[in-house]
């Protein structure tokens, strides 16, 4: 049985990356450096824009984060694809939180818009995931819209984020 808490610490997220949080058959978050959040501050089965589930997570920003040193030299900015990946990570994490089993894989996104950036001078990135639908059949899949905010200002939106849980990924 999954320990369904409303919030998770960095240690909890690292445990997920080791396959310890949702059990041996549950989905895992990536390990650092690809783990793109420091904590989950809220998870609910209701709420969000569609009242079908909501996740909010945060990443603390500091100038020493790995991506600022290489993207770009002399013009450091967090790659937008990392914010998108964080949203996919959270959709998969939510599926595990619901008790879903399998290996998480991003399946797509309908539309992404970038209207701002994360610079090394920022303090905090907030991710908000609004679930639209959960498919719990042979394929377990989450469909959600997401938002990325930096220091409280909306900078990315993603519609129709899709993540599936697979028992076998060898033919994927």
UniProtKB/Swiss-Prot annotation:
It catalyses: a (3R)-hydroxyacyl-[ACP] = a (2E)-enoyl-[ACP] + H2O; (3R)-hydroxydecanoyl-[ACP] = (2E)-decenoyl-[ACP] + H2O; (2E)-decenoyl-[ACP] = (3Z)-decenoyl-[ACP]. The active site is at residue 71. One of its GO terms (cellular component) is cytoplasm. Pfam families: FabA. It is found in: Cytoplasm. Keywords: Cytoplasm, Fatty acid biosynthesis, Fatty acid metabolism, Isomerase, Lipid biosynthesis, Lipid metabolism, Lyase. GO terms for biological process: unsaturated fatty acid biosynthetic process. CDD domains: FabA. GO terms for molecular function: (3R)-hydroxyacyl-[acyl-carrier-protein] dehydratase activity; trans-2-decenoyl-acyl-carrier-protein isomerase activity. The keyword Transcription does not apply. Its EC number is 4.2.1.59, 5.3.3.14. Pathway: Lipid metabolism; fatty acid biosynthesis. PANTHER family: 3-HYDROXYACYL-[ACYL-CARRIER-PROTEIN] DEHYDRATASE, 3-HYDROXYDECANOYL-[ACYL-CARRIER-PROTEIN] DEHYDRATASE. Homodimer. Belongs to the thioester dehydratase family. FabA subfamily. Necessary for the introduction of cis unsaturation into fatty acids. Catalyzes the dehydration of (3R)-3-hydroxydecanoyl-ACP to E-(2)-decenoyl-ACP and then its isomerization to Z-(3)-decenoyl-ACP. Can catalyze the dehydratase reaction for beta-hydroxyacyl-ACPs with saturated chain lengths up to 16:0, being most active on intermediate chain length. This is 3-hydroxydecanoyl-[acyl-carrier-protein] dehydratase. The gene is fabA.
């Amino acid at each position: 049985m999954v320990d369904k808490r409303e919030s998770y610490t960095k240690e909890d997220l690292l445990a997920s990356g080791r396959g310890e949080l949702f059990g041996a058959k549950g989905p895992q978050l990536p390990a650092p450096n690809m783990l793109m959040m420091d904590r989950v501050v809220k998870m609910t089965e209701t709420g969000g824009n569609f009242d079908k589930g909501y996740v909010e997570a945060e990443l603390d920003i500091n100038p020493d984060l790995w991506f600022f040193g290489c993207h770009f030299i002399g013009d450091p900015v967090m790659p937008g694809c990392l914010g998108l990946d964080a949203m996919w990570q959270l959709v998969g994490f939510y599926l595990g939180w619901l008790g879903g089993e399998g290996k998480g894989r991003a399946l797509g996104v309908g539309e992404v818009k970038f209207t701002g950036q994360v610079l090394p001078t920022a303090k905090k990135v907030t991710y908000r995931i609004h679930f639209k639908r959960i498919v719990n059949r042979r394929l377990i899949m989450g469909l959600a819209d997401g938002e990325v905010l930096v220091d409280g200002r909306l900078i990315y939106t993603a519609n129709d984020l899709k993540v599936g849980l697979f028992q076998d990924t060898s033919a994927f």
